Regions:
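An acidic-aromatic
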Residues: 57-110, 185-186
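Solvent-exposed strand-loop boundary residues in beta-sheet-rich modules
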Residues: 50, 90-92, 181
C-alpha cells in the first residue's frame, strides 16, 4: 500500500511538472508570435475597481507605443522611442520621462514581444484550467487558452497575471493582473490588426501648449 501511494504521488508530480513545461512551451510560442509582428493596432479597455478606461492602441516593434483614450476623453499615453508622455486632460498636466528605460516601463505589462519577454523571465507559467480552449467569459462563445503566471520574486508589481490567448492566432485577448495590494487590473484587446506599416510619426505626441509639464515623473534621468 505504501508503495502504491508513492507511485500515485509520483504520477501526480510528473503530470504537474509536465503541465508546467507545456504551459511554458505554449507561452514561448506566443512570445515567438509577437516577436514576428512588426506593428499592430487594436481597441483596448482597462478596468479596475477605481477606473474604467477605453481607447485605441498602436504598437510598433520594438517598443513604440501610443494609446489614445476615448474614456477619459483626450487622455494619451505615448512612447516615441525617446520620451514617455502621459497627458491627463482632467488636470491639464503632461507627465514626461526621457530615458531608454521609459520604453520598458511603457510596454512591460502589455501585449508585446518585450512584455512577453519580461513575463517569461519573471513569472512561472501554468495552465489555468488545462491546455484546451475554454470560453473567455462564462457566457462568451469566444474560446481562448488561459494561462496563470505566478511571480518568481517579491519585487514584481503584479503577484499574479492571467492571460487569455487565442488558440488560432496566438494573440493575447486579455491580461488580468493582481497587484501586491490585492487589486485587480484587466486589459482587454479586440479588433487587432497586424502589420499595417504604421509610421513612426504616429507615435509623436504634441501636448497642448497650455498644459502644465512635469518632467522625470518616474525617475531622474541619471538614476
Amino acid at each position: 500500500m505504501f508503495f502504491s501511494i508513492i507511485g500515485f504521488l509520483s504520477i501526480g508530480i510528473s503530470a504537474y511538472a509536465q503541465d508546467i513545461l507545456t504551459a511554458d512551451h505554449f507561452l514561448a510560442s506566443v512570445a515567438e508570435r509577437y516577436a514576428s509582428i512588426k506593428d499592430y493596432q487594436a481597441k483596448v479597455s482597462i478596468e479596475s475597481a477605481k477606473v474604467a478606461m477605453k481607447g485605441s492602441i498602436i504598437h510598433k516593434r520594438p517598443n513604440l507605443l501610443r494609446i489614445d483614450f476615448s474614456q477619459p476623453v483626450e487622455q494619451v499615453i505615448a512612447y516615441n522611442g525617446e520620451t514617455l508622455t502621459v497627458y491627463l486632460p482632467e488636470y491639464r498636466a503632461v507627465l514626461s520621462q526621457s530615458s531608454p528605460t521609459a520604453g520598458k516601463v511603457a510596454t512591460a505589462s502589455l501585449a508585446s514581444a518585450q512584455g512577453l519577454s519580461t513575463m517569461r523571465r519573471n513569472y512561472t507559467a501554468s495552465f489555468t484550467t488545462g491546455p484546451d480552449p475554454v470560453p473567455l467569459d462564462e457566457k462568451s462563445a469566444e474560446l481562448v487558452i488561459k494561462l496563470t503566471l505566478t511571480r518568481r520574486s517579491m519585487s514584481e508589481g503584479f503577484r499574479e497575471l492571467k492571460l487569455a490567448i487565442s488558440p488560432e492566432t496566438k494573440l493575447i485577448r486579455r491580461i488580468e493582473g493582481r497587484t501586491i495590494a490585492d487589486e485587480q487590473v484587466i486589459l482587454d484587446f479586440s479588433d487587432i490588426v497586424l502589420d499595417q506599416g504604421i509610421p513612426e510619426a504616429r507615435f509623436a505626441y504634441d501636448s497642448p501648449a497650455s498644459a502644465n509639464r512635469y518632467n522625470n515623473f518616474l525617475f531622474k534621468e541619471n538614476d
